[in-house]
Amino acid sequence: MADFEIPNFGELLAEHLGAVPPEAYPFLLSQLERTAADRYRGWAQDVPEHAEGLLACAQSEDEIADRVESMFPPSAEHRALVARIIPEAKETYYSAFDSFTPIQQMTIQAGAERQGAGAWQNLKTLYPDRADEFDALSKIELGSADYLNTLLPTLLD
């Protein structure tokens, strides 16, 4: 159990998430998944003895983004809007990790993965015909969280 609070990423990113129309929301989330993939790649460098598993998590984040972009192909307008929003959203996301060690950051990310799984479940109300696909996305998120939760007790701060 972490001796610090895991941020609520929905609240942390609310300003950015609310800056897009509902139909662009999945694309914005997909770009945040790519941001998480970048974090995993960084941790793979920080903890090279576990690079294989961390890079698999990065690949999972990219897979989620690819699936979402396939499910909800963004219009040119939505791509442009998200391109304007994502730098600040990424900065906000990264700021939640700034004062922590890589191991603590991975602890936070495990919580973020579980929150991400919940976010995909919440979208089922807007897109009930995509429920199975959202379940699959949530399963991928939970797989990364489970990996981190298994890895973290083996690491020392």
Task: Tell me what each language-model feature is.
Residues M1-D157:
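Non-heme di-metal
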